[in-house]
Amino acid sequence: MASPTSTNPAHDHFETFVQAQLCQDVLSSFQGLCRALGVESGGGLPQYHKIKAQLNYWSAKSLWAKLDKRASQPAYQQGQACTNTKCLVVGAGPCGLRAAVELALLGARVVLVEKRTKFSRHNVLHLWPFTIHDLRALGAKKFYGRFCTGTLDHISIRQLQLLLLKVALLLGVEIHWGFTFTGLQPPPKKGSGWRARIQPSPPAQLASYEFDVLISAGGGKFVPEGFTIREMRGKLAIGITANFVNGRTVEETQVPEISGVARIYNQKFFQSLLKATGIDLENIVYYKDDTHYFVMTAKKQCLLRLGVLRQDLPETDQLLGKANVVPEALQQFARAAADFATQGKLGKLEFAQDARGRPDVAAFDFTSMMRSESSARIQEKHGARLLLGLVGDCLVEPFWPLGTGVARGFLAAFDAAWMVKRWAEGTGPLELLAERESLYQLLSQTSPENMHRNVAQYGLDPATRYPNLNLRAVTPNQVQDLYDIMDKEHARKKSDETDARKTTTGSAGTEELLHWCQEQTAGFPGVSVTDFSSSWADGRALCALVHRLQPGLLEPSELQGMSALEATAWALRVAEYELGIIPVLSAQAVVAGSDPLGLIAYLSHFHSAFKNTPHSSGLVSQPHGTPSAILFLGKLQRSLQRTRTKVEEETPCTEEPPVSEPSVPPALPSEHEEAGAEDVCELCGKRLYILERFCVDGHFFHRGCFCCRTCEATLRPGGYGQYPGDGYFYCLQHLPQEDQKEADNNGSPENQELPTPGDSTTQSGPSSPVPPVTEASPVPSPSQPARRLIRLSSVERLRLSSLNIIPDSGVEPPPKPPRSCLDLAQESLKSSFMGWGVLRAPQVPEAIEKGEEEEEEEEEEEEEEEELPPPLALEVEQSLLTLAKNSGDMTKYPTWRRTLMRRAKEEEMKRFCKAQAIQRRLNEIEAAMRELETEGMKLEVALRKESSSPEKQKKLWLEQLLQLIQKKNSLVTEEAELMITVQELDLEEKQRQLDHEFRGINREETLKTQADRLSEDRVLRKLLDVVNQRDALIQFQEERRLREMPV
């Protein structure tokens, strides 16, 4: 067997090339290798075959085997699929290089231009399972021996670029460094082709290069002309990245990485951080690679308070500009946060140096993310067609905590290469673009959970990666505007079609709503709906609507003797409590007919939720989407407040009692009171427009005003509480607690029981969200007068009447205390090993070659990754992790121990990514709602103004306002669903922490003190409460899933 240090100098060049850790070293060693072998670089696949033929010793052969295995996939057709295709790739980032590799494997000629001359970015990227397998298949372990050797799967951008650069060079990609692509140069005449405009003046070979495919991977700030970019904006979010020198000492290697800590479910960590350092964060991540890499999201007020930002400026670019950021304070901020997160175990933190020799710490803005409206275009001039495709950040900017940049970037690179293959096969332009856009629709929805589980089968063909693939989701007619024949003009036609489509879409909005209301209320005596004002004044139409949608709640016979105001107020309450329809106007306004716009907005909620429900159905219907989720969250919120009030009443107090909240709804206003209470925010006293109205228990606020008293965070259903001592609202993190006794009596938010779905027997009336000014009186009951004496609201009475009284003899006995989770873990572990036979360490020959040993270890890791066992339950997973860390027996099974540790970290990362995605989307929804509110305010002012505007114009404004209301309804739908998931994540984290705490105090009964028993009992009660809450949540989700299944 040949030795790399033998007489063949090419072996030395190859080993230097493989081990090179700087961009310039890679290029120089590869040029030396090509000279030694007499091969011209940049020659495509023929160059690769020449190099492989002359380097046949063991170290090189292991790499060739991997690359050949990839190239043998059917989609590449042995490198003959695109032999006549010429491609230009812009950008040598990870996605650009990955696209270049795929195009080279297809046999295309690939030229890549990059404006930089070296790789210097230390930031660490999280990797999805398929990206790990993909990079291993390209020889990642050969080029970078520490690739994914820790408990977290990640790699620095610089190392990723280096290994992909080496593969691209071996496959014959021609790379030009230090040149910037500035635009396209169309063919001047028939018979010529497309060229690139490049700065500075390129060599003749590059300047004259004509290509028919352009793949742009130039980053988010560069998108070729013709593509439309859409901004996805959220609340202000300031990210901070910091890279510290990794000395690779024993102490540093033992510091655990942090897959992600998010405030959305782990508030104690951030409270401790704030108390110890004064730093207020939303999240923090710590990875170890070439550097110690930290990334975190900081709050603006904290940065201002600690002097990191000099002053508060309205524009984000100015706020985070060099002139407004204090470098020394920023470094101190990042160092303190990193030191606290790692408990000071990294010792003295020294910043790594960036490309300019400065400390590698930066503050950046990810308030908004850019996304291209389309992923590809085709331009044609003088008969020459050019296919343009986007990959990487210029296609979709990633959200850093989720690890989506590399994963979706690689997927986009595969999809773009597949598009080029189809282009080379002669697929028609519109058909090709339709297929590409169908794939693009899937990209933003992809996650490790909804892709094919077997990552070993992933290839260029999209069917190997995406389950339930539909390449005809987008039709050719929908992508005609992406095919640009530059000799013709389509812009005006497209604009006219768009305007006509908008007008047609909105023209039937109010008419459709009115017709639907007429259908739902038809047949009820005394009800005739003809408009959005007087037809609803007596309350009968609204009661009829509620009765039709959910029979049994509002019987028409019960309306006898009720005033219009009482009937309307009753219907509003029942719709809120039983259907989840939040009011946007008061009962007075409905009766007076003074706010038809508000009534339209309110009725549109019914229409959105029940428009697909047959109005002739006699079954009790349940709303889909918003109302079902809001109904559940509303019950949770009332349960939270009711339990706190109960604890306060049971707690003896020697001081002056705080203002108590009534257990019945606020008093109904008299018919003589002035209507329009919903027009003014009860917190700021300013005017409320329809789209701004946020209702809590009959009181109206601006969404921006309804925030935490302490941190000013937006409050959402299920995530806040009202403190009776001052009447203010707080997020659960800052909700004032009474004392430990109250906490033990389940008074804290974490002990609140989630309402059981469909349970209408445990709900009391809501409490007033503001300190009451006058004593509350009960809602008049529509039943017998004697009922009024017990001061029950109508909703409470209805729930009480639906109770099924059964004897207690059939009630199950109290649950037994659970067995130790550690015992369950040990049993699970034993059963996992059953049937394996005797486990022995593999017999390794003493004279094995080092390269063969490394190859065998790498194959073991790949097999372990490809054949993952099915996921375990959360509790068992955590217990197995504890056992893996603490049990001496696990040393006998290092593979299992490594697998358990990795899977536990993966579960942490999944929760973190899910929480961050939710937080990001909630911020985007909030920003979108503010924009809708601004637009709606302008339209509402125009509609309410006494002006001489023609009726046609007013009707158009009304339709536009209804469209905005419907958009807001959709956003509220999504927000409610996300808040359900927030509850799920929070309960999972609480159960994990309580389970860990319970294991820590669980010991032999003879060794327990009285304090131990009390602590164990307290933790056990909390744990059982959380389990019950999770059970209620799962039951709710299952019931909703069954409702949504097609009959």
Curated annotation (Swiss-Prot):
Biased composition (Acidic residues): 851-868
Record-annotated LIM zinc-binding domain positions: 679-741
Compartment(s) of residence: Cytoplasm; Cytoplasm, Cytoskeleton; Endosome membrane; Midbody
InterPro entries listed in its UniProt record: bMERB_dom, CH_dom, CH_dom_sf, F-actin_Monoox_Mical, FAD-bd, FAD/NAD-bd_sf, Znf_LIM
Residue sites binding FAD per the record: 95, 114-116, 121-123, 181, 293, 393
GO terms for biological process, alphabetical: actin filament depolymerization; negative regulation of apoptotic process; regulation of regulated secretory pathway; sulfur oxidation
Gene3D superfamilies in the cross-refs: Calponin-like domain, Cysteine Rich Protein, FAD/NAD(P)-binding domain
Domain Calponin-homology (CH): 507-611
Highest rank taxon of the organism: Eukaryota
Ranges for region Monooxygenase domain: 1-489
GO molecular function: actin binding; F-actin monooxygenase activity; FAD binding; metal ion binding; monooxygenase activity; NAD(P)H oxidase H2O2-forming activity; NADPH oxidase H202-forming activity; oxidoreductase activity, acting on paired donors, with incorporation or reduction of molecular oxygen, NAD(P)H as one donor, and incorporation of one atom of oxygen
Coiled coil: 912-996
Binding site residues for Zn(2+) 2: 708, 711, 731, 734
CDD domains according to UniProt: CH_MICAL1 (cd21196), LIM_Mical_like (cd09358)
Polar residues: compositionally biased ranges: 745-767
Sites bearing Phosphothreonine, chain numbering: 475
Cofactor(s) listed: FAD
Main enzyme class: oxidoreductase
Binding site for Zn(2+) 1: 681, 684, 702, 705
Family, per entry: Belongs to the Mical family.
Free-text comment about domains: The C-terminal coiled coil part contains the plexin-interacting region. The bivalent Mical/EHBP Rab binding (bMERB) domain, mediates binding to predominantly Rab8, Rab10, Rab13 and Rab15 (in their GTP-bound forms).
Subunit note: Interacts with STK38 and STK38L. Associates with the SH3 domain of NEDD9. Interacts with VIM and PLXNA3. Interacts with RAB1B, RAB8A, RAB10, RAB13 and RAB15 (in their GTP-bound forms); binding to RAB1B is of low affinity compared to other Rab proteins; at least in case of RAB8A and RAB10 can bind 2 molecules of the Rab proteins simultaneously. Interacts with GRAF1/ARHGAP26, GRAF2/ARHGAP10, RAB8A, RAB8B and RAB10; may bind simultaneously to GRAFs and Rabs and connects GRAFs to Rabs. Does not interact with RAB1 and RAB11A.
PANTHER family according to UniProt: [F-ACTIN]-MONOOXYGENASE MICAL1, CALPONIN HOMOLOGY DOMAIN-CONTAINING PROTEIN DDB_G0272472-RELATED
Function summary: Monooxygenase that promotes depolymerization of F-actin by mediating oxidation of specific methionine residues on actin to form methionine-sulfoxide, resulting in actin filament disassembly and preventing repolymerization. In the absence of actin, it also functions as a NADPH oxidase producing H(2)O(2). Acts as a cytoskeletal regulator that connects NEDD9 to intermediate filaments. Also acts as a negative regulator of apoptosis via its interaction with STK38 and STK38L; acts by antagonizing STK38 and STK38L activation by MST1/STK4.
Name the UniProt record assigns to this protein: [F-actin]-monooxygenase MICAL1
Species name: Rattus norvegicus
